């Protein structure tokens, strides 16, 4: 109970200040209306400034609570691809989502600019959060766009992968390798195991009631929450 896992972005909004990518706050932190509960037509959004986040971290540290940030990828990224359409497979402008769900416009795993973006964002996160852990999401990433994306299909060929599930494993492993090079330990949701090639140093957060792959991962020495 002394860990605060802070989910900082999703399809409905980007909630952390970025000095490197200010458009994320100008555009990605705001949606046209609030579709949860009692919908209204008012613009909804906002984000935590870096100073506000530092205040939260200090508040938690004083109470022996460690703050673990999560930047979800490659799915649940509508706030990103609506701000930067060129980071999606189709490059088409889309709005932020206003309801809950699983949405098919995700980061393009065949586009090298996507990795540059992710590394840039994670650099900002690491500068802000002293925690040794970073959560990279990995849940609920539908692959329909990847199946029909020339760049993603070319990446599969170039990296000698077998399918789009392995492409997500490739995506995760590049992010994990980058974070490990910075001295961080990486967490991800249990769907990340579906690729069968995930870095076995990754700590899996199983939110789906002890899935078979998670049990097998644990039995092979993997770390599971």
Protein language model features and the residues they cover:
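Active-site core of glycosidic bond-cleaving carbohydrate-active enzymes
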Residues: 81, 96-101, 111-115, 127-135, ...
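Aromatic- and acidic-residue-enriched carbohydrate-binding clefts of CAZyme catalytic domains
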Residues: 10-62, 77-116, 144-169
């Amino acid at each position: 109970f002394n860990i605060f896992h802070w989910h900082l972005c999703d399809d409905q909004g980007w909630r952390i200040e970025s000095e490197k990518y200010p458009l994320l706050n100008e555009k990605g932190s705001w949606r046209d209306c609030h579709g949860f509960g009692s919908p209204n037509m008012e613009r909804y959004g906002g984000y935590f400034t870096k100073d506000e986040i530092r205040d939260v971290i200090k508040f938690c540290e004083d109470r022996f609570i460690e703050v673990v940030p999560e930047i979800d990828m490659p799915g649940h990224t509508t706030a990103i691809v609506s701000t930067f359409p060129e980071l999606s497979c189709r490059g088409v402008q889309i709005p932020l989502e206003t309801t809950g769900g699983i949405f098919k416009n995700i980061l393009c795993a065949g586009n090298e600019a996507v990795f540059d973006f992710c590394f840039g964002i994670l650099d900002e996160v690491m500068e802000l959060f002293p925690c040794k852990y970073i959560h990279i999401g990995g849940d609920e990433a539908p692959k329909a766009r990847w199946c029909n994306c020339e760049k993603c299909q070319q990446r599969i060929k170039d990296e000698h992968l077998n399918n789009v599930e392995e492409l997500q494993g490739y995506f995760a492993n590049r992010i994990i390798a980058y974070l490990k090079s910075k001295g961080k330990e990486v967490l991800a949701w249990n769907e990340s195991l579906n690729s069968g090639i995930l870095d076995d140093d990754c700590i899996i957060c199983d939110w789906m009631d002890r899935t078979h792959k998670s049990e097998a991962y644990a039995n092979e020495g993997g770390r599971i929450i």
